[in-house]
């Protein structure tokens, strides 16, 4: 049998890439964990956080947010990922705190913070976020959609799901000349950004430059980017990439936020 022609090969590669991306974006398997809550009735205490999003209301995440235990947080690489939770997992614990199935349907939350370990306490008596435990410290409004306030802690099952966002990805440029710190937020699809590259200007000499993750979802470049239009390539944990060309005009200023393309 003759080998396929180049156009056919390109089509096959494209189909393979699409299937791989669809598989990566599909919901993962259910895993047992536990959940608590923090931040107050209006979730104001969840603002800020180890992902660097600051005001999660303004970043589009609302109150459906969670702080992850250290083993799940991955030093910030899980920031922006989405998880579906349902109360009453198989990992043990008191399920009486769960709302009835008809009332307590599953919820989808975004990882926006770290639940720090407390090695002074055992994992089943306050050290909920100690390694190797899988734990969600939910915003209070999110917790109350699946469990009763008085329960405090409940067993849950969770799985990774694709993030659904309104509008495009957001790029907030902070820092100063030669220290550009770009916060990437409102990321759809896998949600967890694992790599960012920036290109300044549009001339022939313009080259993509890899950025280094500084903390959370703040990405750093030591190049002089002032006075040039900026393009960004964002790659998520499932190895999918989206390019936003000239998302920031040449006259951009530090402190501004720009909206680019989105994962679909």
UniProtKB/Swiss-Prot annotation:
Keywords from the UniProt entry: Cell wall, Cell wall biogenesis/degradation, Membrane, Secreted, Signal
Protein's membrane topology: Peripheral membrane protein
Subcellular location: Secreted, Cell wall; Membrane
Signal peptide: 1-24
Domain (Expansin-like EG45): residue spans on this chain: 48-168
GO cellular component assignments: extracellular region; membrane
Entries under Gene3D superfamilies matching the protein: Expansin, cellulose-binding-like domain, RlpA-like domain
One GO process term, biological-process aspect: plant-type cell wall loosening
Location of the Expansin-like CBD domain: 178-260
SMART domains listed in its UniProt record: DPBB_1 (SM00837)
Pfam families in alphabetical order: DPBB_1, Expansin_C
Protein's UniProt keywords contain ATP-binding: no
Function recorded in the entry: May cause loosening and extension of plant cell walls by disrupting non-covalent bonding between cellulose microfibrils and matrix glucans. No enzymatic activity has been found. May be required for rapid internodal elongation in deepwater rice during submergence.
Similarity comment: family membership: Belongs to the expansin family. Expansin A subfamily.
Protein name from the UniProt record: Expansin-A21
Organism: Oryza sativa subsp. japonica (Rice)
